[in-house]
Regions:
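PP2C/PPM-type serine/threonine phosphatase catalytic core
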Residues: 2-395
């Protein structure tokens, strides 16, 4: 009974948090109210099912329905362009450019009003590799948001937050998101392995995602894409803060795990300095990252899809965060990236300018090497734009 009361009280608090700010109006307001109604039903579903051994199929289905409705109401961006909903502090600029290796295997997503929460946003960038890499990247992009939403709401239903302990609440919220991300990544990787329409045995994808909830961002990284925050230092200069680790095979903790699992890590003679992951007795697959979804040929030999999950409190000094694939970071420094983005007059074009700069840098710094796919999301925390916009452009 006590636990039942805690869950009930929690959901009263949770559902209250879906209230819409006055600045949201028009179509955005109508869409958010529709999502809020859906969220209430999903929350009640979890509350009624607590303690039972039933699957979370109902919750997943509801989360996927929410995603479809968000897309219908232009709250989700999946191509190059930008999204800025009236009443939101967020402005997200997205751009992706195909490299010189064939089809573009990068993809991205921005979901404003994530989980029907007016103060939440989800964004992610995915870098596929292998023969089916572009299909794997898109599959993970489609699966991860709804799976994360489902696991987050289910974890919330099983957690009691003390409203009198603000510091404890912040600590618990992080662990709720971390637990949700760990469950989600395991589920998405398992689902991908069972999905027969995509051959992911020798193909995979990285995944770098961020959830902004109020003034907190939660960052989860699988692979070698990177998130860099731009913040004002005490002396007024804009400085970069790298929020993620590039999970490359040469990192001590990564190579140790791979070697313990009988995998191998070494560089090819024609690629000095580029460490890759190899099977015990074969010169394949030669992955340049130590964590990824898919790539089941080497999952038993040290490659994992476990995310590193971190969080950060956003202050007035923090201006924006850049999420980009290694096609950017191979030729652009963290400092260069934030300078390019901050000096772009039109925030909506920031990602495009960064991607174009990286493409030029490839020609100068990597002559004779085929340019990688280049993709970036620039998420501004304190948007000065006040308009309802979701604009897409061709890649």
């Amino acid at each position: 009974p006590a636990k039942s009361k805690n869950v009930e009280s929690f959901f009263i608090h949770l559902l209250a948090s879906t209230c819409l700010p006055p600045s949201l109006d028009g179509e955005a307001n109508e869409a958010m109210r529709h999502f809020s109604s859906m969220f209430n039903g999903l929350a009640r579903s979890f509350s009624m099912r607590r303690g039972k051994n039933s699957s979370n199929d109902d919750g997943r289905e509801a989360a996927e329905t929410m995603a479809k409705d968000a897309k219908k109401h232009d709250m989700i961006l999946r191509s190059s362009g930008f999204v800025n909903v009236d009443g939101s502090n967020n402005l997200a600029s997205v751009c992706s450019k195909r490299g010189r290796k064939g089809v573009n295997q990068d993809c991205a997503i921005v979901w404003e009003g994530f989980g029907s929460q007016a103060d939440m946003l989800f964004c992610g960038i995915f870098d596929g590799h292998g023969p089916w890499g572009h299909f794997v990247a898109k599959k993970v992009r489609e699966s991860m948001p709804s799976s994360l939403l489902c696991n987050w709401q289910e974890t919330l239903a099983q957690t009691s937050l003390d409203p009198d302990l603000e510091s404890d609440k912040k600590h618990q919220r992080f662990h709720i998101w971390k637990h949700s991300y760990l469950k989600t990544c395991a589920a998405v990787d398992h689902e991908l392995e069972q999905y027969r329409k995509i051959d992911s045995f020798y193909s995979g994808t990285t995944a770098l995602t961020i959830v902004r909830q109020g003034d907190i961002i939660y960052v989860a990284n699988v692979g070698d894409s990177r998130a860099v925050l731009a913040t004002n230092s005490d002396d007024g200069n804009l400085v970069p803060v790298q929020l993620t680790v590039d999970f490359k095979p040469n990192l001590p903790q990564e190579s140790e795990r791979i070697i313990q699992c009988k995998g191998r890590v070494f560089c090819m003679h024609d690629e000095p300095g580029v460490h890759r992951v190899w099977l015990p007795n074969e010169e394949s697959p030669g992955l340049a990252m130590s964590r990824a979804f898919g790539d089941y040929c080497i999952k038993d030999y040290g490659l994992i899809s476990v995310p590193e999950v971190t969080h950060r409190h956003i202050t007035n000094k923090d201006q924006f965060v850049v999420l980009a694939t290694d096609g950017v970071w191979d030729v652009v420094s963290n400092q260069e990236a934030i300078q390019i983005v901050s000096s772009t007059p039109d925030k909506a074009k920031a990602a495009k300018r960064l991607v174009e700069f990286a493409a030029c840098a490839w020609k100068k710094k990597r002559k004779g090497i085929a340019m990688d796919d280049i993709s970036a999301i620039c998420l501004f925390f304190h948007s000065s734009h006040h308009e309802v916009n979701l604009v897409t452009t061709s890649k």
